[in-house]
Amino acid sequence: MNRAFSALSAASSRASASVGSVAPVAALTLLGVTATDLRSAVIFVLCLVVAIAFHEFAHAIVAHRLGDPTPSRDGRVTLNPLVHADPIGTVALPIMAGLLHAPLFGWGRPVMTQPRFYTRKINMRAGMALVSVAGPLANVLQAIVTLAVLKILMVAGVHNAGLTDVLIIFFSLNLTLAFFNLLPIHPLDGGKILAWMLPARYGHIDDTLARYGWTLLLALMLIPGLLLTLFTPVAIVRDWALRLLA
C-alpha cells in the first residue's frame, strides 16, 4: 500500500512538473508568440542593456568630472549594466512589447545630478547641457564602433548571419536612442540642451515644454504612426550607413 502510494505520489509530482513547464509555453502559443519572436525580444533586451549602460555611464562620468559627487555616491560611475538597468523599462516592457508585436522601446535608470556642485568655470545650465549631451553622444559612438566592426568582419570574410543581425540591431538601436533623447522635450536630454540654448527672454518656451513634457511623450507613444514618422531620419541614416558597407 505504501509503495503504491509512493509511486502514485511520484507520478503525480512528475505530472505537476510537466504541466507547470508546459503552461508558459501554451500561454505564449495562445498569444501567437513564436520562437522567432522570443529570440528577437531577448536580443533586443540584451542590446538595450548594453546601449543604456554606456548612455547612463556617460551622463555619470561627465557630472562627476564637473564636480558633482552624486553619481559616484550612487554607484553610477561604472559600466556595470546591472547598475543602470531598470527592471521595468529595460527588461519587462521591452520583452512584453517584443512578444506582443508592439513597438519596441525602453529606458534605463536616470542618473541623478545636482548642478549646484558643478565647477564655477561654467554656469549650471551649461553644465546640465554637457551632462545631457554626453548620453546621446555615447550612443552615436557605439553606433560608429558597431559599423566599424561590421566593416571589419566583411573585409575579413566572416559571414555569420546571426552575428550580423545582432550588430545591425545594436547599431540601429543606438541611432534611435541618440535621436530620441535629443528631442527638445523634458525630461529627455534634448529638453535640458534646449534650456541652455534658449535666450532668457524665451524661457517661457522651456517652461511650457517642461510642464507638458510627459503629455507630449505619451502622445508620441500612443498616436498611431506618429513615432514611426518622427524616426524617418533615423531610418534614412541607418540605410545610408549600411549601404556604405556594401
Residue ranges and their predicted role:
Residues 1-246:
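Hydrophobic transmembrane alpha-helices and their immediate loop junctions
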